[in-house]
């Protein structure tokens, strides 16, 4: 993608029409792409289970949690079971890099370049960096880019920097030992380059180490995202490598409260369009995104998409929107959800995503139970302070209505939008008890106590939706995807 060009936000979101094809007859384009990667997908949703106890596994921390749900209710389990792990993921990765979508092969694209920057997800995301980085780096070096001129940037956004141990986990021990791997630091303004403003007025500060490189690559994965519709691609540029001033605007009520800035919404999502424009300004050249399958704590690769950033991401989103979409005919009386286990449920800050994913399918006045381990507690210091100092969701929303945006308020704002609609219950054993009173819902010491509270006073035969992997399933009422 070349430098410059008009700042017309409508130019960056063309072709993301995601209205699903019938489940038994996917689009020919999607099936052709799937077949080339060695798999065929088919979606299925589990029907109701009536009036008997049910043993269910939930993604929770690294090991999961198996719970017996009480009899007397209509359970509907929503699982993205149709994403099948690739039989030969290494070959699929090689093929994606050598036969990319709407782009020359990566090695050809890198020829003549003197430096490269690769943006990768931080420890809170299960991106398959360890599998993809070695063949990607090999092609850059084969094209003539010296190893010392390749920088791997961990796209932390406003998250904390990665520890040395985490860098090895993120990139793999060999890559971490032999290559330059550094964390983005959003608060260090001097480490960013100002690229101007977007058409809507967002000031764009992007990590200088990314912008100054000759070749700009992102490596991520695609899943439903609570504000952006779907993750991956442009998100690895901003907010991943953006400065604090940029991130605050992207997470402001301007975008947070837009009805189209939600899971599964992309074609007309204003935040998606904003990030595409920012990625264009930063000269985003090449993308590698994976779609992940489920596997009781493991997230094996289901598909690989590489190439020109917009075209490759569009193909990936089409795939994910098919295999992760699960629908209900009507809203549920209650929902049991998770934050998809490790690493997404490391902190309560990240675990909020499991609650927002459930909010779209619960009745007004219904109940949501979140199961999240939260071994690292609350999250960042700013989020912890906000949570501790705002025991009322209503007062919090009133206070931020006119005030300047502060770091991490957006996650609490998303939680408040849910608690205004539904009663939220929590089993979050890693969260210090001092925060229980500030959760805008009741926390319980055991999962059994939480489930008992969820089902108490519900009438016999009440409809309870169960989402064992929380935000990794795009749960909707009817065919609401692609708005």
PLM region descriptions:
Residues 2-9, 14-15, 21, 31, ...:
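Short, low-complexity intrinsically disordered segments enriched in A/P/G/S/L with frequent Arg
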Residues 51-96:
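N-terminal amphipathic/basic leader segments beginning at the initiator methionine
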Residues 101-117, 142-148, 326-333, 362-363, ...:
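Glycine-rich phosphate/diphosphate-binding loops that line cofactor/substrate pockets in enzymes
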Residues 115-126, 151-157, 218, 336-338:
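Short glycine-rich or small-residue beta-strand-to-loop segments that form or flank ligand, phosphate
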Residues 122-129, 340-350:
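Short, glycine-rich nucleotide/cofactor-binding loops
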Residues 141, 351-483:
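C-terminal non-catalytic interaction/assembly regions of soluble proteins
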Residues 167-192, 392-407:
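A glycine-rich helix N-cap at a beta->alpha junction
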Residues 177-198, 202-327:
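Conserved, well-structured core segments that form the ligand-binding/active-site neighborhood
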């Amino acid at each position: 993608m070349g430098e410059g060009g008009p700042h017309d936000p409508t130019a960056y979101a063309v072709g993301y029409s995601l209205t699903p094809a019938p489940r038994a007859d996917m689009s020919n384009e999607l099936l052709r792409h799937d077949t080339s990667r060695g798999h065929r997908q088919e979606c299925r949703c589990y029907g109701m289970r009536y009036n008997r106890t049910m043993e269910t596994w939930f993604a929770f921390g690294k090991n999961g949690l198996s719970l017996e749900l009480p009899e007397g209710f209509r359970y509907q389990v929503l699982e993205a079971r149709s994403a099948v792990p690739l039989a030969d993921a290494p070959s699929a990765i090689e093929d994606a890099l050598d036969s990319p979508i709407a782009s020359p092969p990566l090695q050809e694209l890198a020829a003549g370049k003197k430096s490269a920057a690769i943006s990768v997800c931080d420890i809170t995301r299960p991106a398959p960096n360890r599998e993809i980085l070695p063949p990607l780096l090999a092609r850059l070096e084969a094209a003539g880019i010296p190893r010392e001129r390749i920088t791997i940037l961990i796209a932390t956004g406003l998250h904390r920097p990665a520890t040395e141990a985490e860098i090895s986990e993120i990139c793999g021990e060999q890559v971490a030992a032999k290559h330059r791997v550094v964390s983005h630091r959003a608060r260090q303004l001097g480490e960013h380059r100002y690229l101007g403003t977007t058409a809507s007025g967002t000031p764009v500060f992007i990590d200088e180490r990314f912008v100054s490189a000759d070749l700009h690559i992102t490596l991520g994965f695609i899943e439903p995202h609570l504000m952006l519709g779907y993750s991956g691609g442009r998100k690895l540029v901003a907010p991943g490598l953006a400065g604090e001033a940029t991130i605050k605007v992207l997470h402001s009520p301007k975008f947070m409260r837009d009805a189209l800035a939600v899971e599964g919404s992309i074609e007309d999502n204003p935040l998606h369009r904003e990030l595409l424009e920012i990625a264009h300004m930063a000269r985003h050249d090449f993308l590698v995104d994976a779609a992940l399958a489920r596997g009781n704590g493991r997230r094996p690769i289901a598909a690989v998409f590489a190439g020109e950033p917009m075209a490759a991401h569009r193909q990936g989103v089409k795939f994910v929107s098919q295999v992760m979409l699960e629908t209900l005919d009507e809203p549920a009386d209650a929902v049991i959800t998770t934050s998809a286990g490790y690493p997404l449920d490391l902190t309560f800050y990240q675990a909020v995503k499991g609650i927002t994913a459930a909010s779209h399918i619960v009745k007004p006045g219904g109940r949501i139970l979140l199961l999240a381990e939260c071994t690292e507690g609350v999250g960042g210091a700013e989020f912890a302070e906000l949570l501790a100092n705002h025991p009322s969701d209503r007062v919090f929303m009133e206070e931020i209505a006119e005030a300047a945006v502060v770091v991490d308020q957006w996650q609490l704002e998303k939680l408040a939008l849910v608690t205004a609609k539904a009663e939220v219950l929590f089993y979050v054993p890693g969260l210090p008890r001092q925060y229980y009173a500030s959760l805008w819902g009741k926390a319980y010491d055991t999962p059994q106590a939480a489930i008992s509270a969820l089902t108490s006073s519900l009438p016999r035969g009440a409809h309870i939706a169960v989402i064992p992997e929380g935000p990794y399933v795009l749960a909707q009422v009817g065919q609401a995807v692609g708005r």
